[in-house]
């Protein structure tokens, strides 16, 4: 595991328990933006998060990060508590199950029907298999995708 992945896991271990319902921890990213290191913690709730929510969560999360010993951060960083936005990542089976009926983007480790990327409506997620309806040029098609082949999945905006 590389240093950044280790930091993300350490952060997840201390942050996840303090984020209480109705909030949900969606993702954690740590990396350089410009010359600054940024720790981004993506949080959501059913009706969406507000600016006040992010301020309240920052007051809860920031002190908890200071309890990680030894300090895993190699340099100073900015803490960003934010919404995952319209193209929210679907990183768990529960997140995928919650996206049934929605328009999603799925990247695969291995091609199905010579395609490694599908974008369409998630019709079902049962027994570790996604069933999606997508457009192939002008025709609607359905594809079944084993969850084990999914490299990345996220909600998508239909244009």
From Swiss-Prot:
One of its GO terms (cellular component) is cytosol. CDD domains: YlxS_C. One of its GO terms (biological process) is ribosomal small subunit assembly. Keywords: Cytoplasm, Ribosome biogenesis. It is found in: Cytoplasm. Required for maturation of 30S ribosomal subunits. PANTHER family: RIBOSOME MATURATION FACTOR RIMP (PTHR33867:SF1). This is Ribosome maturation factor RimP.
């Amino acid at each position: 595991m590389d240093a950044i992945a280790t930091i993300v896991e350490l952060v997840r271990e201390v942050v996840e328990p303090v984020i209480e319902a109705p909030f949900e921890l969606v993702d954690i990213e740590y990396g350089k933006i410009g010359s600054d290191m940024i720790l981004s913690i993506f949080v959501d709730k059913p009706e969406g998060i507000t600016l006040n929510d992010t301020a309240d969560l920052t007051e809860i999360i920031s002190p908890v990060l200071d309890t990680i010993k030894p300090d895993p951060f190699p340099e100073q960083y900015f803490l960003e508590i934010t919404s995952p936005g319209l193209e929210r990542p679907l990183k768990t089976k529960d997140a995928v199950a919650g996206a049934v009926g929605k328009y999603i983007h799925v990247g695969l480790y291995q091609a199905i029907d010579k395609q490694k990327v599908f974008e369409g409506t998630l019709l079902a997620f049962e027994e570790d298999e996604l069933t999606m309806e997508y457009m192939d040029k002008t025709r609607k098609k359905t594809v079944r995708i084993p969850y084990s082949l999914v490299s990345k999945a996220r909600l998508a905006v239909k244009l």
